[in-house]
Curated annotation (Swiss-Prot):
Its EC number is 6.3.2.4. Mg(2+) 2 binds at residues 294, 296. GO terms for biological process: cell wall organization; peptidoglycan biosynthetic process; regulation of cell shape. This is D-alanine--D-alanine ligase. ATP binds at residues 159-210. Keywords: ATP-binding, Cell shape, Cell wall biogenesis/degradation, Cytoplasm, Ligase, Magnesium, Manganese, Metal-binding, Nucleotide-binding, Peptidoglycan synthesis. The lineage of its organism: Bacteria, Pseudomonadati, Campylobacterota, Epsilonproteobacteria, Nautiliales. Signal peptide: none annotated. Binds 2 magnesium or manganese ions per subunit. One of its GO terms (molecular function) is D-alanine-D-alanine ligase activity.
Length: 342
């Protein structure tokens, strides 16, 4: 199976996508790498050039430029164009473009097989508000929340401390913990720099957090469950480093009841909305009760470090991707009308 990894994108998480791709360059054998820059141009990148300064310096523009057309990516020359020989595209664009449905729409429009969230899954998981509404529809608890828009009065419904998050961003960008009213205005200003909507939740000290990745191919694949041990809040720089992980992690020490509860919740969220994607879901546990925190439709480094045999998972998903219905356009209705007029 020949994979083409698409990364970059016009996103606040552009650099994280680069780090994420560098981390997995040796994990997907023989992969082709396609960079989507801030102008939304595609470039074919040699594996040897997958270094952060290759992109920050602008040297990537010396790489061959690609065009996205029906069936795949193409490299043009003076006399001809050559199709890039990829069987399946892997969406590794974090944030906007990759997780909001733009790339999924393009790939589906041009009938290209890809591993990544489909349009509906992208739209729901890209919005923290829609994620919570979807989780509740699936019967999974979420923490209390309040949505605040720029034009709204800056009044919050919770006692302090609270956590403030841009509604459409990940990687801790624009996120603040607010301990009293004197800190509120500044935290909101920071969040509104990145988004027109923010989500406010109670900030609960000592809450347990667990991450589980998974995917569905011929069968369901669950990763190890990671117990997240971190500071009060991972800032962007720490998340930046976190996305570059590639070594395996230890499976969390959980009782079997909680382990099954987390897996069952994951499966309810995943199937069928995220078919064809490898996703990670972050859960909270408080007083023995499970809550969904966030859905990561394009997790850092595809969460490869959570799986015992990531390549086998990738191959199984690639072989069982969702297929669009073949709609036959035969103009039968128009032709029947024309025949009736004669």
């Amino acid at each position: 199976m020949q994979y083409a990894v698409v990364f970059g994108g016009k996103s606040y998480e552009h650099e994280i996508s680069i780090v994420s791709t560098i981390a997995i360059k040796d994990i997907i054998p023989g992969a082709i790498f396609i960079f989507l820059d801030g102008n939304r141009d595609f470039y074919l990148i040699e594996k040897a050039d997958l270094k952060s300064n290759y992109f920050s310096s602008g040297n990537y523009k010396k790489s061959p430029k690609l065009e996205l057309k029906k069936g795949g990516f193409y490299q043009k020359s003076l006399l001809k164009e050559k199709k890039i020989p990829a069987d399946v595209v892997i969406n590794l664009v974090h944030g906007a473009d990759g997780e909001d449905g733009k790339l999924a729409s393009l790939l589906e429009f041009f009938e290209i097989d890809y591993i990544g969230p489909r349009i509906e899954g992208s739209v729901i998981s890209y919005s923290k508000l829609l994620t919570k509404l979807y989780a509740k529809e699936c019967g999974i608890e979420v923490l209390p929340y309040q949505l605040l828009r720029k034009q709204d009065k800056k009044i919050i419904d919770f006692e302090y401390p609270v956590i403030i998050k841009p509604n459409h961003l990940g990687s801790s960008i624009g996120v603040s913990v607010v301990y009293d009213s004197s800190e509120l205005e500044y935290a909101l200003d920071v969040a509104f720099e990145f988004d027109d909507e923010v989500l406010i939740e109670p900030f609960i000290e000592g809450i347990e957090e667990y991450n589980l990745a998974g995917a569905k191919g011929q069968t369901f694949h669950f990763s190890k469950i990671e117990a997240v041990k971190k500071e009060k809040l991972l800032d962007f720089e720490k998340k930046y480093l976190d996305f570059g992980r590639s070594g395996e992690v230890k499976d969390a020490s959980l009782n079997e009841t909680l382990r099954l509860h987390i897996r069952n919740a994951f499966e309810k969220i995943y199937d069928p909305l995220f078919s064809g994607a490898i996703i990670r879901i972050d859960f909270f546990v408080r007083d023995g009760k499970l809550y969904l925190n966030e859905i990561n439709p394009v997790p850092g480094s595809l969460a490869n470090y959570l799986f015992g045999d990531f390549r086998a998972v990738l191959e199984d998903v690639a072989k069982h991707l969702p297929k669009s219905k073949n709609i036959v356009i035969d103009y039968r209705y128009i032709n029947s009308i024309q025949s009736a007029k004669k």
